[in-house]
């Protein structure tokens, strides 16, 4: 057992930080006792409004209803760019570091404004209007941020699709959001490899006849398919466009973006976030969680295809007039010192990454870290999944040299911004704990009957009051949002995560309690993977569960039952893995695929995934009650054949 130590707030950190523990306690109390007063003050302090709101909040969590800053009008791009121009027009807004260490760029706020306005005018010239959906399928290059902000500027709703998703996944997201415009690049570059983005778009669009415009950024100058009249080059269109584009006044509750996340029922959910509340959540958490001060260089290593990239590469930092770093590459290319080299090269002060990356780099040993200085670092963050105490301590002692507090943040695509987190100047740290709630956030633990657990204990993590950046809908299927997040425990937001609360009130996230696997910080629905596997003619049935993985946090373990007449083989296994890669993306390929003559089912035909989870995790002494199975003998057969031995 790893002994948990407590790390008090260092004096130097407390003296520099915006908030100490007394400040936290006072503001937190105000935020839950007088939420309208608190959030009204914050919205005025953090955002510029074209028109004031007439009510801070109203809604009913039992019905999943939340309206924030009703009547207020603002524009996200204006808040992220225009209002900074007078004071910091020549300040660097985006530092871009390419996949190849020889490539980098610095974009000032003035240049950002220029490019965003021109791209916004290009979109308008192609018929994009307020409320239209635009799909962005891009590598990690500055143009991805320009595209998001250009949409926000004219009131279009962007749907960013991670560049690692397959053409089929891209197609499904374009169709679900009814996008008529796609912004992409010829190719992406990642870890020295080229990703055929435009080719993938072409495959996806075979089934998307309504797409009338594809804007293509030239990244590699590789050969790509081209449809005359529909496809336009980004650089040519920008050159011809005006740099004058007024920011559209948007209602606080107007949609800002749709972002697809895995669901336990198979079909990805288009999480809808709105303008005012979302931007306030992103800006406020960015400032206080990362203690961002003028002049700091801030680096979040996420991809903009995930919510972390939305909130903590683009919207939160830019709303605060920050310098934010965008990285095209991967942690181990050209070698395992790359992250630390980038930190030295750009004098990064605040670094935010995922436990998966930390664990992978920890396995490479201390030498790649020690060969760099990292003296600029002040704070280290963790996001995407719980960080195990061993990785936490390595991150703290080796990477941060015991100088840098670790900000272990818990939040989700649906929450829009960080909900449970330490604050650098206020929170003593415990390795592996996300510690305490952010302002206005009221977490509770619920038992199996849905009753709140008092004091220390373990249960389902839920939130019992609305917060500004919460999900507003699932695009095109509002009932699904209610059924998923608000129906399981009426009066609460159901997170899908389990948690433990210790005697100090600190929260420890214990992992998913629903059928979603967290692989390297990517949420993958088990039903999505199962659906992909059963597309193969040889597969009769598939059941997918998660099991522990030293680096990725969780691995995907698939049990596959074949059709009569089909035989297990290495070739078939490779076909199935390729099929999952094609349908979802290579990151969703099972790590283990076990042939299962039959699966453990109840008499009503329900697969007992609990038992499969135990087999996958090799927890064979705690299988629990198998008497309700239609054929209990199935279990021993699966145990005997675990990992196809």
UniProtKB/Swiss-Prot annotation:
Residue positions where N6-acetyllysine is found in the record: 606
Post-translational modification: Acetylated. Deacetylation by the SIR2-homolog deacetylase activates the enzyme.
Entry's EC annotation: 6.2.1.1
Record flagged with keyword Calcium: no
Reaction(s) this enzyme catalyzes, per UniProt: acetate + ATP + CoA = acetyl-CoA + AMP + diphosphate
Residues noted as binding ATP in the record, renumbered to the chain: 384-386, 408-413, 497, 512, 523
Keywords, comma-separated and alphabetical: Acetylation, ATP-binding, Ligase, Magnesium, Metal-binding, Nucleotide-binding
TM region(s), chain numbering: none
GO cellular component, one term: cytosol
Alphabetized InterPro entries for the sequence: Ac_CoA_lig, ACAS_N, AMP-bd_C, AMP-bd_C_sf, AMP-binding_CS, AMP-dep_synth/lig_dom, ANL_N_sf
Function of the molecule: Catalyzes the conversion of acetate into acetyl-CoA (AcCoA), an essential intermediate at the junction of anabolic and catabolic pathways. AcsA undergoes a two-step reaction. In the first half reaction, AcsA combines acetate with ATP to form acetyl-adenylate (AcAMP) intermediate. In the second half reaction, it can then transfer the acetyl group from AcAMP to the sulfhydryl group of CoA, forming the product AcCoA.
Family to which this protein belongs: Belongs to the ATP-dependent AMP-binding enzyme family.
Identification of the protein by name: Acetyl-coenzyme A synthetase 2
